[in-house]
Amino acid sequence: MYIRSALLALAALAGQALAFPLNSLPERDNAGLDIQLSSTGNTRVKAVITNNGDEAMSFVKFNTLFDSSMVRKVKISKDGSAVPFTGIFGYYDINNLPKEAFATLSPGASLEAEFDIAETADLSEGGSFKVSADGLLPIAATKGSTKVDGAIQFKSNELTIDIDGDEAAKVHASVMSTLGKRSRVDGRTCQGRAGQIIVNSLRSCVGYAQAAAQGAANGDAQKFQEYFKTTSPQVRQNVARRFQAIAQECSSPSQGRSIVFCQDVYGYCQRGLIAYTVFANSHVATCPDFYRLPARVNQGLGPDHGYVMVHELTHAPAVFSPYTQDYAYGYQQCRRLNAQQSLGNADNYSLFAAAVARGA
């Protein structure tokens, strides 16, 4: 784990979206919800959601088609094979979302968003690609509420797009070039208080990950079953290895396979986003809301700084493979995932680590 800053000297003195593409979260009747995709030019796609129901609907925009960040919005395939995603994975506290995280649609109203799918996927091969979106749209209990109490399952139409590979390559290369430049940010982002907070966050991450590794390998089988829906010895050992890799990464602030930034060096932060991981280079950036979280939570399953670091590093392919997705957030939603989904969902790991370390 590299921390980009003058923090390296400090560490030596001191000693680390919503993509809800699943069908097992609490669902509501999806009658009246319509999502249509259309091609607007080479790799640009427009999504339109329409509420054809009789009541207003408030849904979460984060990690969906209507998130302005480079999160996974659609599924892309070519010749039957999925095209890998290369964007960002963000962490949000699903139980503490700001009002601007939601959009409200009155009956008959529509909302649209346009994005470039080449920003988060390498489509330079060109030719015919299939593009679609499906999953669950998290919804609020009532209009104007910020409490998520369910989700509406949706499935868009499927597009077949003939893509100019050279033009797609330019879009993707531009994004990758930006990431490359950012990886050489100087030591200004982690000075002072922010730097000390990150040092302490990494220490907390080590504690969580080490406890979770022990719990996964040799701990209570029922506790493991609660979070990962299996007690397979092979699966338990593999989960333990992931936690061991995270513990090692968080214990090495001056070396390692990832970099933590104390500021939003990529410009993806928005209110409600706590931190994010850039898939392409396993960089973790913290947002202002990260510093509003408690440094340490000793009871329950709420997020703190170490919790978030564990969550983000499960996304980092340089730390452990396969990397995780953001299928669901928070205990109530994560508990409804099946075994395969749970093992691939970042927050299940943070929740398990918190449960073991805090005795929750």
From Swiss-Prot:
Q: List the disulfide bonds.
A: 190-262, 269-287
Keyword Hydrolase assigned to the entry: answer is yes
Matches recorded under InterPro entries = Fungal_M35_metalloproteases (IPR050414), MetalloPept_cat_dom_sf (IPR024079), Peptidase_M35 (IPR001384)
Where do the TM regions start and end? none
Give the CC-aspect GO terms.
extracellular region
Question: What is the required cofactor set for this protein?
Answer: Zn(2+)
Q: Which reaction is this enzyme known to catalyze?
A: Preferential cleavage of bonds with hydrophobic residues in P1'. Also 3-Asn-|-Gln-4 and 8-Gly-|-Ser-9 bonds in insulin B chain
What EC number(s) does this enzyme carry? 3.4.24.39
Binding positions (Zn(2+))? 311, 315, 326
- Catalytic residues of the enzyme: 312
GO MF, one example:
metalloendopeptidase activity
Gene Ontology BP annotations = proteolysis
Q: Which Pfam families match?
A: Peptidase_M35 (PF02102)
Give the UniProt subcellular location, in the record's own words: Secreted
Q: Which residues form the propeptide?
A: 20-182
Protein keywords: Cleavage on pair of basic residues, Disulfide bond, Hydrolase, Metal-binding, Metalloprotease, Protease, Secreted, Signal, Zinc, Zymogen
Q: In terms of one coarse class, where is the protein primarily found? A: secreted
Functional summary from the UniProt entry: Secreted metalloproteinase that allows assimilation of proteinaceous substrates. Shows high activities on basic nuclear substrates such as histone and protamine.
Family listed: Belongs to the peptidase M35 family.
Protein name as annotated? Neutral protease 2 homolog UREG_01255
Organism whose genome encodes this protein: Uncinocarpus reesii (strain UAMH 1704)
